[in-house]
Amino acid sequence: MKFPETHRDLFADEVKAFAFLSTTMASGTPQVTPIWFDLEKDYILLNSARGRVKDRNMRARPNVALAIVDPNNPYRYIQVRGKVIKITEEGARAHIDRLAKKYLGKKIFPGDPSEVRVTYFVQPEAFSTMG
């Protein structure tokens, strides 16, 4: 699915926008987490540690929604609804390091090195925009 050009800039590394990820708990209630992200081809890539709530939710219920807000204008945002189509630990440590460079300016992610990192590939299915 093609990203709306009017809001494509929110995905640029230099913007450093956070995504607010909505997953679904086993009870059916929503769970929202601010999260770092980047793009690879037409996929939105997310990263977490194995066993966290969002990890468990995305494995069990792969439909997700993300809201990405313009850091310079909170009334401008894009909502993405999609599906996690791939979950992998392969390359996930390098991916979180890449995200740490984008968001923190650090070469190495400063989190717990014993965590098993996981990368999630989200395939967008629908977009809506504001502003």
Q: Where are these predicted regions, by residue range?
A:
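Short, surface-exposed beta-strand-loop junctions and turns on beta-sheet-rich folds
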Residues: 52-54, 73
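Extreme N-terminal tail/first-helix region
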Residues: 1-19
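Hydrophobic alpha-helical segments typical of transmembrane helices
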Residues: 6-7, 54, 95
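A generic structural signal for nonpolar/aromatic side chains embedded in well-ordered alpha-helices
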Residues: 10-12, 57-58, 99, 122
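Short beta-strand segments
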Residues: 16-50, 58, 64-68, 79
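Charged, gly/pro-rich active-site loop segments
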Residues: 1-3, 76-131
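A short beta-turn/loop motif at secondary-structure boundaries
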Residues: 27-29, 70-74, 112-114
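A short, polar/proline- and glycine-enriched secondary-structure boundary/capping micro-motif
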Residues: 55-61, 77, 105
